[in-house]
Regions:
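An exposed, glycine/acidic-rich loop-and-rim segment of catalytic or binding clefts
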Residues: 1-188
Length: 188
């Protein structure tokens, strides 16, 4: 079965940038796709996030079957509910989906702002995907109060060759980094 030694390091700098660094080494070949499941609401606890504005450096998202398992197809985002190429409000849509991140994203894989844009969260990683999950209440009339942002190698990569490599070979170390930064606008 082997032994996996995993380490998580948190590093905060003077620019209010938080790096989370995941490292792993195993005595046998295994899978390694660590991520965080952190929820954000930039206007306050229990407040509606539908007017938060989102931008994702992505042109494609993963198609899933009726069990939420990726089919292997990457679908164009343009002119769909998945099109966050430009900053715009989340709206009432429910999300529990994976976006394929572009390679030239210049430190902003994802940007989330408060409705008045007084606060901006940027998230980036050396990973090729991001899962965005609106805390989808069972009651469709209930408000969504948080957004989870999970930077990771694309889900189900072990079954889809072009989704990325999550195999951790025996006695090799893999390291991944996710960076979060919140900025307050001086103009708002």
């Amino acid at each position: 079965a082997g032994q996996l030694a995993a380490q998580v390091t948190y590093r905060l700098d003077d620019e209010d940038r938080l790096d989370i660094i995941f490292s792993g080494v195993s005595t046998e070949n295994t899978l390694f796709n660590p991520m965080t499941h952190v929820y954000f609401n930039l206007v306050g606890k229990d407040q509606d996030i539908s007017q938060h504005k989102l931008q994702i450096a992505s042109r494609k998202h993963l198609e899933v079957d009726n069990h939420m398992i990726p089919t292997g197809n990457m679908i164009d985002n343009q002119n769909t509910k998945f099109d966050f190429a430009h900053l715009h409000a989340l709206g009432q849509e429910h999300y529990d989906d994976a976006w394929v991140l572009g390679l030239s994203r210049q430190g902003e894989g994802l940007k989330l702002t408060s409705p008045d844009e007084s606060l901006t969260l940027t998230v980036d990683s050396d990973r090729n995907g991001v899962v965005v999950f609106t805390a989808n209440p069972d009651d469709n009339s209930a408000i969504k109060t948080a957004l989870a942002i999970e930077m990771q190698t694309l889900p189900d990569a072990v079954n889809h060759e072009d989704f990325g490599d999550i195999v951790l070979p025996a006695n090799e170390t893999k390291t991944y980094t996710v960076t979060y930064q919140i900025k307050k606008s001086e103009d708002k």
